[in-house]
From Swiss-Prot:
PANTHER family linked to this entry: DNA REPAIR PROTEIN RECO (PTHR33991:SF1)
GO process terms (BP): DNA recombination; double-strand break repair
Protein's UniProt keywords contain Secreted: no
Coiled-coil ranges (or none): none
HAMAP family: RecO (MF_00201)
InterPro entries in the record: ARFGAP/RecO (IPR037278), DNA_rep/recomb_RecO_N (IPR022572), NA-bd_OB-fold (IPR012340), RecO (IPR003717), RecO_C (IPR042242)
Name the record gives this protein: DNA repair protein RecO
NCBIfam families (UniProt xref): reco
Family of this protein: Belongs to the RecO family.
Pfam families for the chain: RecO_C, RecO_N
Any Gene Ontology CC annotation: bacterial nucleoid
Signal sequence annotation: none
Keywords, in A-Z order: DNA damage, DNA recombination, DNA repair
Length: 234
């Protein structure tokens, strides 16, 4: 049965085929061989691209499935990502590839991913969509933290003026060392309500999400982030 899917990444395979890393609605991440997809007359040739809502079918018992159907999904808004939005889309794709295992069902995360791409298409501001997806990814990983209580004491953060973020733990009101970034509790309370209209507060959210995800990403740098920085230096 066909299911909604988007291409996260693609590789050349042999002379005429491609390997696609798909993010699908029902099966999560799946790697498939698109046989003959590079042939000039293949109906899949122009479809096997990131950020194109698709319907896909595949079969096989191994980790590498065989693609049997790939067609555009007519009922979903077309995704038009250019410039910084395109690199932001690559960033989301890389997060999924790095942190979501293959063949692990993730229907809610699929919807979050599609929603993030649509929001980036429709808005001039990409940061809110990125930060929201990062938070939903942390929830999917079981790494969500509380925005209202001190992770050490259980006391409400609002009893204090300043707090600090400890990755894989949460917010605390006592710093671990003098190198930690201090956050205004008032800002954290606004972020907890997803009040991201203020650019300075949105920047704080970026720091928090980056620190939270770094625990799971490890030391290997994100290729999409390096590519984006490279364009800014040109």
């Amino acid at each position: 049965m066909a299911q909604r899917a988007l291409v996260l990444h693609r590789w050349d395979y042999q002379e005429t085929s491609l390997i696609l890393d798909l993010f699908t609605e029902d099966k999560g991440r799946v790697r498939v061989v698109a046989k003959g997809a590079k042939r000039p007359k293949s109906p899949w040739r122009g479809l096997a691209q990131p950020f194109m809502p698709l319907l896909a079918e595949f079969q096989g018992r191994s980790d590498l499935k065989t693609l049997t159907l790939l067609e555009p999904q007519q009922t979903t808004q077309k995704l038009l990502l250019q410039g910084d939005k395109l690199y932001s889309g690559f960033y989301l794709n890389e997060l999924i590839q790095r942190l979501v295992p293959t063949e692990a069902e993730a229907p809610e995360l699929f919807e979050s991913y599609l929603s993030a791409l649509q929001n980036m298409t429709n808005s001039e501001r990409v940061e809110p969509a990125l930060r929201q997806f990062e938070w939903q990814l942390l929830q999917h990983l079981g790494a969500a933290f509380d925005w209202h209580y001190d992770a050490d004491t259980g006391n409400v953060l609002s009893d204090s003026k300043w707090c600090y973020f400890i990755p894989d733990h949460g917010f605390v009101t006592q710093a671990r060392d003098n190198q930690q970034r201090a956050y205004s509790v008032a800002d954290i309370q606004k972020l907890a309500a997803w009040d991201v209209d203020d650019e300075n507060r949105l920047r704080l959210l970026k720091y928090i999400m980056r620190d939270a995800l770094a625990v799971y990403l490890g030391d290997k740098p994100l290729r999409s982030r390096e590519l984006f920085r490279g364009t800014k230096r040109q």
